[in-house]
Protein backbone atom coordinates (compact mmCIF):
# COMPACT_ATOMS: atom_id res chain seq x y z
CA UNK A 1 0.00 0.00 0.00
CA UNK A 2 2.78 2.46 0.94
CA UNK A 3 4.66 1.66 -2.27
CA UNK A 4 1.80 3.06 -4.35
CA UNK A 5 2.58 6.51 -2.97
CA UNK A 6 6.36 6.11 -3.05
CA UNK A 7 6.65 4.87 -6.61
CA UNK A 8 6.03 8.23 -8.39
CA UNK A 9 8.85 9.75 -6.34
CA UNK A 10 11.16 6.79 -6.88
CA UNK A 11 10.51 6.90 -10.63
CA UNK A 12 11.79 10.48 -10.71
CA UNK A 13 15.18 9.16 -9.64
CA UNK A 14 17.76 7.47 -11.84
CA UNK A 15 16.83 3.75 -11.80
CA UNK A 16 19.94 2.47 -10.03
CA UNK A 17 19.63 5.20 -7.40
CA UNK A 18 15.98 4.28 -6.84
CA UNK A 19 16.96 0.62 -6.62
CA UNK A 20 19.57 1.26 -3.92
CA UNK A 21 17.25 3.58 -1.99
CA UNK A 22 14.43 1.03 -2.02
CA UNK A 23 16.66 -1.75 -0.70
CA UNK A 24 18.06 0.48 2.03
CA UNK A 25 14.53 1.46 3.06
CA UNK A 26 13.67 -2.23 3.16
CA UNK A 27 16.56 -2.82 5.55
CA UNK A 28 15.32 0.04 7.76
CA UNK A 29 11.79 -1.38 7.87
CA UNK A 30 13.19 -4.80 8.68
CA UNK A 31 15.17 -3.40 11.60
CA UNK A 32 11.92 -2.12 13.06
CA UNK A 33 10.21 -5.51 12.66
CA UNK A 34 7.55 -4.21 10.29
CA UNK A 35 8.35 -6.89 7.75
CA UNK A 36 8.32 -9.64 10.37
CA UNK A 37 4.91 -8.50 11.58
CA UNK A 38 3.63 -8.53 8.00
CA UNK A 39 5.03 -12.00 7.39
CA UNK A 40 3.06 -13.42 10.31
CA UNK A 41 -0.15 -12.55 8.42
CA UNK A 42 1.13 -13.81 5.07
CA UNK A 43 -0.73 -16.67 3.33
CA UNK A 44 1.22 -19.83 2.59
CA UNK A 45 0.83 -22.43 -0.15
CA UNK A 46 3.48 -25.10 0.50
CA UNK A 47 4.89 -26.65 -2.66
CA UNK A 48 7.44 -29.49 -2.89
CA UNK A 49 9.71 -29.25 -5.94
CA UNK A 50 13.20 -30.74 -6.50
CA UNK A 51 12.79 -32.41 -3.10
CA UNK A 52 12.63 -28.96 -1.46
CA UNK A 53 9.55 -27.74 0.40
CA UNK A 54 8.84 -24.16 -0.65
CA UNK A 55 6.52 -22.17 1.68
CA UNK A 56 4.82 -20.91 -1.47
CA UNK A 57 5.61 -21.06 -5.20
CA UNK A 58 6.35 -17.34 -5.66
CA UNK A 59 10.05 -16.47 -5.73
CA UNK A 60 12.29 -13.49 -6.34
CA UNK A 61 14.30 -13.65 -9.56
CA UNK A 62 18.03 -13.01 -9.65
CA UNK A 63 19.25 -9.48 -10.23
CA UNK A 64 17.58 -7.53 -7.43
CA UNK A 65 20.11 -8.53 -4.75
CA UNK A 66 23.27 -9.28 -6.67
CA UNK A 67 25.58 -9.57 -3.66
CA UNK A 68 23.28 -11.17 -1.10
CA UNK A 69 23.19 -8.08 1.11
CA UNK A 70 19.41 -8.04 1.63
CA UNK A 71 18.48 -11.72 1.90
CA UNK A 72 16.84 -11.51 5.33
CA UNK A 73 14.81 -8.47 4.35
CA UNK A 74 13.65 -9.94 1.04
CA UNK A 75 12.63 -13.23 2.64
CA UNK A 76 10.66 -11.11 5.09
CA UNK A 77 8.47 -9.89 2.23
CA UNK A 78 6.91 -13.34 2.04
CA UNK A 79 8.64 -14.89 -0.96
CA UNK A 80 8.64 -18.67 -1.02
CA UNK A 81 12.26 -18.47 -2.14
CA UNK A 82 14.76 -15.91 -3.36
CA UNK A 83 17.55 -16.09 -5.91
CA UNK A 84 20.56 -13.80 -5.45
CA UNK A 85 23.28 -12.94 -7.96
CA UNK A 86 24.26 -13.24 -10.70
CA UNK A 87 27.68 -13.76 -9.17
CA UNK A 88 31.00 -14.40 -10.89
CA UNK A 89 34.28 -15.78 -9.51
CA UNK A 90 36.01 -12.39 -9.50
CA UNK A 91 34.45 -8.99 -8.75
CA UNK A 92 33.60 -6.93 -11.82
CA UNK A 93 32.00 -3.50 -12.33
CA UNK A 94 29.66 -4.44 -15.15
CA UNK A 95 28.85 -2.12 -18.03
CA UNK A 96 29.11 1.65 -17.85
CA UNK A 97 26.17 3.74 -16.61
CA UNK A 98 23.41 4.47 -17.42
CA UNK A 99 22.50 0.81 -17.79
CA UNK A 100 18.86 0.56 -16.64
CA UNK A 101 16.02 2.23 -18.55
CA UNK A 102 12.33 2.40 -17.70
CA UNK A 103 9.55 1.98 -20.25
CA UNK A 104 6.60 2.86 -17.98
CA UNK A 105 4.03 2.92 -20.79
CA UNK A 106 4.77 -0.78 -21.35
CA UNK A 107 5.48 -1.53 -17.68
CA UNK A 108 8.89 -2.75 -18.75
CA UNK A 109 12.61 -2.25 -18.18
CA UNK A 110 15.70 -2.54 -20.32
CA UNK A 111 18.94 -3.35 -18.55
CA UNK A 112 22.51 -3.92 -19.65
CA UNK A 113 24.07 -4.39 -16.21
CA UNK A 114 26.71 -6.88 -17.33
CA UNK A 115 26.98 -9.12 -14.24
CA UNK A 116 28.18 -6.32 -11.94
CA UNK A 117 28.94 -7.93 -8.56
CA UNK A 118 31.48 -8.13 -5.74
CA UNK A 119 32.53 -11.70 -6.47
CA UNK A 120 31.65 -15.12 -5.12
CA UNK A 121 33.85 -14.88 -2.01
CA UNK A 122 31.96 -11.78 -0.86
CA UNK A 123 28.63 -13.51 -1.45
CA UNK A 124 29.71 -16.55 0.57
CA UNK A 125 30.40 -14.27 3.54
CA UNK A 126 26.91 -12.79 3.21
CA UNK A 127 25.39 -16.27 3.13
CA UNK A 128 27.23 -17.17 6.32
CA UNK A 129 25.72 -14.13 8.08
CA UNK A 130 22.07 -14.50 7.12
CA UNK A 131 19.66 -15.05 9.99
CA UNK A 132 16.24 -15.70 8.45
CA UNK A 133 15.49 -19.28 7.48
CA UNK A 134 14.24 -19.62 3.95
CA UNK A 135 15.00 -21.09 0.54
CA UNK A 136 17.93 -19.25 -1.10
CA UNK A 137 19.39 -20.01 -4.51
CA UNK A 138 22.28 -18.35 -6.28
CA UNK A 139 22.55 -17.44 -9.95
CA UNK A 140 26.09 -17.95 -11.31
CA UNK A 141 27.80 -16.60 -14.42
CA UNK A 142 31.19 -16.15 -16.02
CA UNK A 143 33.49 -13.16 -15.82
CA UNK A 144 33.63 -10.85 -18.83
CA UNK A 145 37.32 -11.61 -19.43
CA UNK A 146 36.89 -15.39 -19.35
CA UNK A 147 36.89 -16.90 -22.87
CA UNK A 148 34.07 -19.28 -23.76
CA UNK A 149 36.48 -22.22 -23.92
CA UNK A 150 37.23 -21.71 -20.21
CA UNK A 151 33.76 -20.59 -19.10
CA UNK A 152 33.18 -23.93 -17.39
CA UNK A 153 35.96 -23.07 -14.93
CA UNK A 154 34.06 -19.98 -13.73
CA UNK A 155 30.83 -21.92 -13.21
CA UNK A 156 32.66 -24.74 -11.44
CA UNK A 157 34.50 -22.26 -9.21
CA UNK A 158 31.27 -20.59 -8.11
CA UNK A 159 29.38 -23.87 -7.68
CA UNK A 160 32.03 -25.36 -5.41
CA UNK A 161 32.36 -22.28 -3.20
CA UNK A 162 28.60 -21.86 -2.81
CA UNK A 163 27.62 -25.49 -2.46
CA UNK A 164 27.39 -25.85 1.31
CA UNK A 165 25.54 -22.55 1.84
CA UNK A 166 22.67 -22.60 -0.66
CA UNK A 167 19.54 -24.57 -1.51
CA UNK A 168 20.05 -24.56 -5.28
CA UNK A 169 22.27 -23.02 -7.96
CA UNK A 170 21.14 -21.58 -11.30
CA UNK A 171 23.52 -21.74 -14.26
CA UNK A 172 23.03 -18.46 -16.13
CA UNK A 173 23.95 -18.95 -19.78
CA UNK A 174 21.34 -16.59 -21.18
CA UNK A 175 22.07 -13.00 -20.14
CA UNK A 176 22.23 -10.83 -23.27
CA UNK A 177 24.62 -8.40 -21.57
CA UNK A 178 27.82 -10.47 -21.51
CA UNK A 179 29.26 -10.84 -25.02
CA UNK A 180 29.01 -14.38 -26.43
CA UNK A 181 27.45 -15.78 -23.23
CA UNK A 182 24.35 -17.05 -25.04
CA UNK A 183 26.57 -19.26 -27.19
CA UNK A 184 26.81 -21.47 -24.10
CA UNK A 185 23.21 -22.51 -24.85
CA UNK A 186 24.44 -24.33 -27.96
CA UNK A 187 25.05 -28.07 -27.83
CA UNK A 188 28.77 -27.56 -28.48
CA UNK A 189 29.34 -25.81 -25.17
CA UNK A 190 26.36 -26.85 -23.07
CA UNK A 191 26.99 -30.60 -23.13
CA UNK A 192 30.52 -30.15 -21.79
CA UNK A 193 29.44 -27.59 -19.17
CA UNK A 194 26.68 -29.81 -17.81
CA UNK A 195 28.93 -32.87 -17.76
CA UNK A 196 31.51 -31.06 -15.65
CA UNK A 197 29.01 -29.51 -13.24
CA UNK A 198 27.15 -32.77 -12.69
CA UNK A 199 30.46 -34.51 -11.92
CA UNK A 200 31.18 -31.76 -9.39
CA UNK A 201 27.69 -32.15 -7.94
CA UNK A 202 28.22 -35.86 -7.27
CA UNK A 203 31.58 -35.24 -5.65
CA UNK A 204 30.29 -32.38 -3.49
CA UNK A 205 27.22 -34.37 -2.46
CA UNK A 206 29.52 -37.06 -1.06
CA UNK A 207 31.65 -34.42 0.65
CA UNK A 208 28.85 -32.40 2.28
CA UNK A 209 26.15 -35.10 2.56
CA UNK A 210 23.60 -32.84 0.88
CA UNK A 211 22.43 -32.49 -2.70
CA UNK A 212 22.22 -29.01 -4.17
CA UNK A 213 20.03 -29.00 -7.31
CA UNK A 214 21.31 -27.42 -10.51
CA UNK A 215 18.95 -25.26 -12.56
CA UNK A 216 19.56 -23.91 -16.05
CA UNK A 217 18.37 -20.41 -17.00
CA UNK A 218 17.56 -19.97 -20.68
CA UNK A 219 16.66 -17.12 -23.01
CA UNK A 220 13.18 -16.29 -24.36
CA UNK A 221 14.56 -15.73 -27.87
CA UNK A 222 15.33 -19.37 -28.68
CA UNK A 223 13.85 -21.26 -31.62
CA UNK A 224 11.78 -24.41 -30.96
CA UNK A 225 14.72 -26.45 -32.26
CA UNK A 226 17.11 -24.78 -29.82
CA UNK A 227 14.68 -25.33 -26.95
CA UNK A 228 14.42 -29.00 -27.88
CA UNK A 229 18.22 -29.34 -27.91
CA UNK A 230 18.48 -27.78 -24.45
CA UNK A 231 15.65 -29.94 -23.13
CA UNK A 232 17.31 -33.08 -24.50
CA UNK A 233 20.64 -32.19 -22.87
CA UNK A 234 18.91 -31.35 -19.60
CA UNK A 235 17.25 -34.77 -19.58
CA UNK A 236 20.45 -36.57 -20.51
CA UNK A 237 22.40 -34.87 -17.73
CA UNK A 238 19.54 -34.99 -15.22
CA UNK A 239 19.47 -31.27 -14.56
CA UNK A 240 17.02 -30.66 -11.73
CA UNK A 241 15.23 -27.59 -13.10
CA UNK A 242 14.98 -25.05 -15.92
CA UNK A 243 14.34 -21.35 -15.33
CA UNK A 244 12.41 -19.84 -18.23
CA UNK A 245 13.23 -17.13 -19.07
CA UNK A 246 15.89 -14.41 -18.96
CA UNK A 247 15.46 -10.96 -20.52
CA UNK A 248 14.86 -10.60 -24.25
CA UNK A 249 16.71 -8.93 -27.10
CA UNK A 250 13.34 -8.41 -28.80
CA UNK A 251 11.52 -5.08 -28.62
CA UNK A 252 8.16 -6.42 -29.78
CA UNK A 253 5.36 -4.15 -28.60
CA UNK A 254 7.71 -1.41 -27.40
CA UNK A 255 9.39 -0.29 -30.63
CA UNK A 256 8.13 3.30 -30.63
CA UNK A 257 8.53 4.00 -26.91
CA UNK A 258 11.24 6.23 -25.41
CA UNK A 259 14.33 4.19 -24.44
CA UNK A 260 13.20 1.21 -26.52
CA UNK A 261 16.29 1.48 -28.72
CA UNK A 262 18.68 1.20 -25.78
CA UNK A 263 20.89 -1.89 -25.86
CA UNK A 264 20.18 -4.57 -23.27
CA UNK A 265 17.62 -7.11 -22.19
CA UNK A 266 13.91 -6.32 -22.07
CA UNK A 267 11.87 -7.42 -19.05
CA UNK A 268 8.35 -6.73 -17.85
CA UNK A 269 4.87 -7.12 -19.33
CA UNK A 270 5.95 -7.42 -22.99
CA UNK A 271 7.93 -10.53 -22.05
CA UNK A 272 4.93 -12.52 -20.81
CA UNK A 273 3.81 -14.00 -24.18
CA UNK A 274 7.39 -15.12 -24.89
CA UNK A 275 7.74 -16.67 -21.44
CA UNK A 276 4.45 -18.50 -21.83
CA UNK A 277 5.46 -19.86 -25.23
CA UNK A 278 8.83 -21.12 -23.95
CA UNK A 279 7.21 -22.75 -20.91
CA UNK A 280 4.70 -24.55 -23.15
CA UNK A 281 7.43 -25.74 -25.51
CA UNK A 282 9.68 -26.88 -22.67
CA UNK A 283 6.85 -28.77 -21.01
CA UNK A 284 6.02 -30.51 -24.28
CA UNK A 285 9.59 -31.85 -24.40
CA UNK A 286 10.15 -32.44 -20.68
CA UNK A 287 6.73 -33.46 -19.40
CA UNK A 288 6.96 -33.68 -15.63
CA UNK A 289 10.53 -35.04 -15.60
CA UNK A 290 12.22 -31.67 -15.06
CA UNK A 291 10.35 -28.91 -13.19
CA UNK A 292 10.12 -25.48 -14.80
CA UNK A 293 10.48 -22.16 -12.98
CA UNK A 294 8.68 -19.45 -14.96
CA UNK A 295 9.85 -15.83 -14.89
CA UNK A 296 9.06 -12.96 -17.21
CA UNK A 297 6.16 -10.52 -17.31
CA UNK A 298 4.30 -11.72 -14.22
CA UNK A 299 2.17 -8.87 -12.88
CA UNK A 300 -0.80 -10.71 -11.40
CA UNK A 301 -2.09 -13.93 -9.95
CA UNK A 302 -3.75 -14.65 -13.28
CA UNK A 303 -0.36 -14.41 -15.03
CA UNK A 304 1.20 -16.80 -12.52
CA UNK A 305 -1.68 -19.28 -12.78
CA UNK A 306 -1.51 -19.22 -16.58
CA UNK A 307 2.17 -20.19 -16.46
CA UNK A 308 1.50 -22.92 -13.91
CA UNK A 309 -1.31 -24.27 -16.10
CA UNK A 310 1.19 -24.30 -18.99
CA UNK A 311 3.59 -26.50 -17.05
CA UNK A 312 5.56 -24.35 -14.59
CA UNK A 313 5.89 -25.51 -10.98
CA UNK A 314 7.24 -22.25 -9.53
CA UNK A 315 7.29 -18.60 -10.62
CA UNK A 316 9.66 -15.70 -10.02
CA UNK A 317 9.13 -11.93 -9.98
CA UNK A 318 11.35 -8.98 -10.75
CA UNK A 319 10.02 -6.17 -12.95
CA UNK A 320 6.46 -6.70 -11.72
CA UNK A 321 7.74 -6.10 -8.21
CA UNK A 322 9.28 -2.78 -9.26
CA UNK A 323 6.04 -1.56 -10.82
CA UNK A 324 3.52 -3.08 -8.40
CA UNK A 325 5.45 -3.18 -5.12
CA UNK A 326 5.75 -5.87 -2.41
CA UNK A 327 1.98 -6.42 -2.20
CA UNK A 328 2.25 -8.24 -5.52
CA UNK A 329 3.81 -11.22 -3.73
CA UNK A 330 0.90 -11.57 -1.33
CA UNK A 331 -1.68 -11.00 -4.05
CA UNK A 332 -0.26 -13.77 -6.23
CA UNK A 333 0.05 -16.28 -3.39
CA UNK A 334 -3.55 -15.57 -2.33
CA UNK A 335 -4.77 -15.97 -5.91
CA UNK A 336 -2.94 -19.28 -6.36
CA UNK A 337 -4.26 -20.55 -3.03
CA UNK A 338 -7.84 -19.68 -3.94
CA UNK A 339 -7.39 -21.20 -7.39
CA UNK A 340 -6.27 -24.48 -5.86
CA UNK A 341 -9.14 -24.46 -3.38
CA UNK A 342 -11.61 -23.88 -6.21
CA UNK A 343 -10.13 -26.76 -8.22
CA UNK A 344 -10.33 -29.03 -5.20
CA UNK A 345 -13.92 -28.01 -4.51
CA UNK A 346 -13.15 -26.35 -1.18
CA UNK A 347 -15.58 -23.61 -0.19
From Swiss-Prot:
Which residues take part in binding substrate?
Answer: 66, 111-115, 172, 177, 246-247
> What GO terms in the biological process aspect are recorded for it?
'de novo' pyrimidine nucleobase biosynthetic process; 'de novo' UMP biosynthetic process; pyrimidine ribonucleotide biosynthetic process
Q: Which PROSITE patterns match?
A: DHODEHASE_1, DHODEHASE_2
Membrane topology, as annotated, equals:
Peripheral membrane protein
Under what name is this protein listed? Dihydroorotate dehydrogenase (quinone)
Explain how, and how many, cofactor molecules are bound. Answer: Binds 1 FMN per subunit.
Q: What does this protein do?
A: Catalyzes the conversion of dihydroorotate to orotate with quinone as electron acceptor.
What Gene Ontology cellular component terms go with this record? Answer: cytoplasm; plasma membrane
User: Which key words are in the record?
Assistant: Cell membrane, Flavoprotein, FMN, Membrane, Oxidoreductase, Pyrimidine biosynthesis
Amino acid sequence: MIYRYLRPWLFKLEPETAHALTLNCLKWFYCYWLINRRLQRFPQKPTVVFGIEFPNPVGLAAGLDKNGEYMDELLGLGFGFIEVGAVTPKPQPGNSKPRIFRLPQARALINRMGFNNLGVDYLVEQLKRRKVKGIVGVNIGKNLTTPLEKAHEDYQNCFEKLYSYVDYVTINISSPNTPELRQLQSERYLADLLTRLKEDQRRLEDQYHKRVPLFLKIAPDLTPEEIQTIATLALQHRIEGIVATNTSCSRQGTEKLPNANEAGGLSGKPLFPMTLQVVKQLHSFLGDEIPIVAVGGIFSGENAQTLINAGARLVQLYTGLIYEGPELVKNIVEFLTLSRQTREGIN
